[in-house]
From Swiss-Prot:
The gene is map-1. Optimum temperature is 55 degrees Celsius. It retained half of its activity after 10 minutes of incubation at 55 degrees Celsius. Removes the N-terminal methionine from nascent proteins. The N-terminal methionine is often cleaved when the second residue in the primary sequence is small and uncharged (Met-Ala-, Cys, Gly, Pro, Ser, Thr, or Val). Requires deformylation of the N(alpha)-formylated initiator methionine before it can be hydrolyzed. It comes from Mycobacterium tuberculosis (strain ATCC 25618 / H37Rv). GO terms for molecular function: initiator methionyl aminopeptidase activity; iron ion binding; metalloaminopeptidase activity. One of its GO terms (cellular component) is cytosol. GO terms for biological process: protein processing. This is Methionine aminopeptidase 1. Substrate binds at residues 88, 193. The keyword Hydrolase applies.
Length: 266
């Protein structure tokens, strides 16, 4: 990963050529396929480790490599974060899905040297109204951020759009959502995590410009309660500080002259 200090002075979010965006979209398609396979396999009695094995199989059969596996010592190909887990949940045989669970899966793949990164949230069977609203609000916040990925905007215009999407969802669903503090999106390309960091809230009009070819991984994380989190003893799993449930949606998105291009679609 390029040292962050070298990138903080950039005036433009790093750009990719048309061919490089196509290469990233190929990696993103692998991620999308893995997430579809996980979603199809998730059922009561299924362990989160078995979902990880499915993802790794799909990724490797596509000629790609899991981005997460071994990253700073991370031991799996996906992050499986269930109920009050926000992000970075480590899959295990002991963690078995049950009806009503709220499941967030984050997945990354590298193909021909280019990374794709995406996350989805879904229920095991029917969700409570609150959990359904939480997941939808998070997805809608993501869509709001994607819509702001246009030439001439600045980094925090995307952050502000995500926050505005969250506040609009609060009105739509008649409940408050916590925007998880300290976590957000990032640049992506030849490395999975690159500058700039993308907050999920904040004032608009600041930070580097978006230009054609700029790419960001946009990933809002919302809770039904607090904005605060705790990292468990495994040094990876992030949970809500108050035990409230959390949701996480993510896409890798490029700025083009024709508008936003989602690179993690199937």
């Amino acid at each position: 990963m390029r040292p962050l200090a070298r990138l903080r002075g950039r005036r433009v979010v790093p750009q990719r050529s048309a061919g490089e965006l196509d290469a990233m979209a190929a990696a993103g398609a692998v991620v999308a396929a893995a997430l579809r396979a996980i979603r199809a396999a998730a059922a009561p009695g299924t362990s989160s480790l078995s979902l990880d094995e499915i993802a790794e199989s799909v990724i490797r059969e596509s000629g790609a490599t899991p981005s997460f596996l071994g990253y700073h010592g991370y031991p799996a190909s996906i992050c499986a974060s269930i109920n009050d887990r926000v992000v970075h949940g480590i899959p295990s045989t002991a963690e078995v899905l049950a009806p009503g669970d709220l499941v967030s899966i984050d997945c990354g793949a590298v193909l021909d040297g280019w990374h794709g990164d995406a996350a989805i949230t879904f229920g095991v069977g029917a969700l409570s109204d609150a959990d359904e609203a939480l997941s939808e609000a998070t997805r809608e916040s993501l869509q709001a951020g994607i819509a702001a990925m246009v030439v001439g905007n600045r980094l925090t215009d995307v952050a502000h759009a995500i926050e505005t999407g969250t506040r609009a969802a609060e009105l739509r669903y008649g409940r408050s959502f916590g925007i998880v503090a300290g976590y957000g999106g990032h640049g992506i390309g030849r490395q999975m995590h690159m500058d700039p960091f993308l907050p999920n809230e904040g004032a608009p009009g600041r930070g580097p410009l978006l230009a054609a070819g700029s790419v960001l991984a946009i990933e809002p994380m919302l809770t039904l309660g607090t904005t605060k989190t705790v990292v468990l003893d495994d040094k990876w799993t992030v949970t809500t500080a108050d035990g409230s449930r959390a949701a996480h949606w993510e896409h890798t998105v490029a700025v083009t002259d024709d508008g936003p291009r989602i690179l993690t679609l199937g």
